[in-house]
Swiss-Prot record:
The gene is trpC. GO terms for biological process: L-tryptophan biosynthetic process. Its EC number is 4.1.1.48. It comes from Kineococcus radiotolerans (strain ATCC BAA-149 / DSM 14245 / SRS30216). This is Indole-3-glycerol phosphate synthase. The keyword Zinc does not apply. One of its GO terms (molecular function) is phosphoribosylanthranilate isomerase activity. Belongs to the TrpC family.
Length: 274
């Protein structure tokens, strides 16, 4: 069993428990009371080329399977506020509990604290989780190609859009890129971390980005430790980077985000973009 298989087994168990507590109709009622989802796709890749650069998705992340405990984060809302003040375009919130120490309550707290779009980062295997995401205020949801059969991927992308949210479709191989595009993914995240082995290789993004059309938002996930990495991913064609561990382990998350944002907006970055 791979790490991903193990995570998914736990996700399904926890999902069954939540379904027993809250019906789908109750979730739908909560979701319909939410204000409309924000347009994350448009913010990550503005139509005006002068406003593009490389955007930053800053993550609230307590633990990871590869590194264990990263940060306690007693107040995720306060951390998200610092990210927003630093210039993050989107705030990502881990909601998987067993391996990442997250929760839907973290998502709710962050949604109430910031004005920028919020991403629910979890292992989605069922449309119930999309309704959960909308009910707790998410504007974006992560869909991992490696965790889904093609029919399910297509269905979940369609449901995400019907709820007004943006689907961030995560890939790690050329085959997964093809599957994502066949499913009409419009925002594709290339995870430089192999979810089956947890190894990181920043060359993964450079290898796969050319397979993703220009009209699709390209996001580099994992492997960002500083501004230099932002420039390297820009050179490979990134529209945005998703950063978690570096930020939660640092002493000044606002400054750390601001440094990455500044690197992404620098004229030199525009010059190196393909």
């Amino acid at each position: 069993m791979t790490v991903l298989d193990d995570i998914l087994a736990g996700v399904r168990e926890d999902l069954a428990a939540r379904k027993a507590l809250t019906t789908l109709d109750e979730l739908k009622e909560r979701a319909h009371r939410q204000v409309p989802a924000k347009d994350a796709q448009g913010l990550l890749k503005p139509r005006d080329a002068e406003q593009r650069g490389v955007k930053v998705i800053a993550e609230v992340k307590r633990r990871s399977p590869s590194k264990g405990a990263l940060a306690t984060i007693p107040d995720p809302a306060a951390l998200a506020e610092q990210y927003e003040l630093g210039g993050a375009t989107v705030i990502s919130v881990l909601t998987e509990q067993r391996r990442f120490g997250g929760s839907l309550e973290d998502l709710r707290a962050v949604r109430c604290a910031v004005d920028v779009p919020v991403l629910r980062k979890d292992f989605v295997v069922d449309s119930y989780q999309l309704w959960e995401a909308r009910a707790w205020g998410a504007d974006v949801v992560l869909l991992i190609v490696a965790a889904l059969e093609q029919e399910a991927l297509v269905s979940l992308i369609e449901r995400t859009r019907s709820l007004g949210m943006t689907a961030l479709v995560e890939v790690h191989t050329a085959e997964e890129v093809a599957r994502a595009l066949d499913a009409d993914a419009r925002v594709v995240g290339v995870n430089n971390r192999n979810l089956k082995t947890l190894e990181v290789d920043n060359a993964t993004f450079a290898d796969l980005a050319p397979l993703i059309p220009d009209h699709v938002v390209r996001i580099a996930e994992s492997g960002v430790s500083g501004p230099r990495d932002v420039v390297e991913f820009a050179r490979a064609g990134a529209d945005a980077v998703l950063v978690g561990e570096t930020l939660v382990r640092g002493e000044d998350p606002r400054r750390a985000v601001a440094d990455l944002v500044a690197a992404g907006a620098h004229p030199a970055v525009q010059a190196v973009r393909p």
